[in-house]
UniProtKB/Swiss-Prot annotation:
InterPro entries: Aldolase_TIM, NanE, RibuloseP-bd_barrel. Pathway: Amino-sugar metabolism; N-acetylneuraminate degradation; D-fructose 6-phosphate from N-acetylneuraminate: step 3/5. GO terms for molecular function: N-acylglucosamine-6-phosphate 2-epimerase activity. One of its GO terms (biological process) is N-acetylneuraminate catabolic process. Keywords: Carbohydrate metabolism, Isomerase. This is Putative N-acetylmannosamine-6-phosphate 2-epimerase. It comes from Yersinia pseudotuberculosis serotype IB (strain PB1/+). It catalyses: an N-acyl-D-glucosamine 6-phosphate = an N-acyl-D-mannosamine 6-phosphate.
Amino acid sequence: MSNLSNLRHKLQNGLIASCQPVPGSAMDTPEIVAAMACAALAGGAVGLRIEGISNIQAVRRATDAPIIGIIKRDLPDSEVRITPWLEDIDALSAAGADIIAFDVTCRERPVSVADLYQRARATGCLTMADASNIDDGLLAHHLGIDFIGTTLSGYTQAIVPTEPDLALVTQLAQAGCRVIAEGRYHSPALAAAAISAGAYAVTVGSAITRIEHICGWFCDAIKQCETEKLTEY
């Protein structure tokens, strides 16, 4: 089995922990991101999704587990945020990413999806498409991109859904894609549902590594209960 085939096999039917703290938060340091990653692996995660060069370098020093690397940018002339430039591809590879993920949506972009894929492939890394719909995913699949993520489903529209897009997972899996289900998988039951729907692996982020979000969910539920009690009287 080749190294790349072995890497693919490691992720199959597994949990990928996305260790991306809220930007500027108390947890947003490379050392803490690396600690999060190690804790996730200790809990059974088979891979990691890490944003930013310094974070990837810190995680790579701490573990040899598979890393999906991304760089997020806010561009003035494009809504594409995830790994938009060719230079990002080179930097991610040099930092230690095993898999390079990039936006494949049909939006105005500084570099074509095909060019990003070719550059990532030239580094020797595996590739992952962050798709928003079936058309994005199939285009990426036909290019030869190794993994198709549902990462951006619901995030290219005005109102973001609350539930994950299991239908897209099924569509892509039936088309022969290695699907990494991602986006709003906030419970073990939803992660299991993604595997049942045909996902190759499942990425979970906020529900594992964003304490602010998790606490917010609990607080909102408590407040809702309090409101309901008050209306009873």
